[in-house]
Amino acid sequence: MGFELLPHTADLKITAWSSTVEGCLAEAARGLVSSFADVGDAPSARTVAFTCEPGPAPELLVELLDEVVFVVDAEDLIPVRVSVARTDAGGLTGEFGVVERASLPPVGPAPKAVTRHDLRFWRAGASWRCEVVVDV
């Protein structure tokens, strides 16, 4: 499990990997958060539940990262923990463990939007990998 952040013109490209689809999605969300906040080992103050409509893995990735952007922009919270599970219908359910945005030092600009440019989700041997570009 892990992620890598790569500069991409005026954007940010996130590559994530894990042994499961859900793990890969969670790693991408962690990667997005680490691009703008120094989460370290900060404990969550509370949880925020989310759901994503059923769809193929690339669309679930966009929906999940859109949820991160929403929580940051609309609620001024930063996810420090991500829990993701697939629903029987093929969607997602989960929780973000969050803290107030002001409680963590910024390390970069907050994301503005998740794009579908260069969006990829694929199986690579025993692991799942994804790539997504985020407008910062």
Residue ranges and their predicted role:
Residues 1-136:
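N-terminal intrinsically disordered, cationic/polar leader segments
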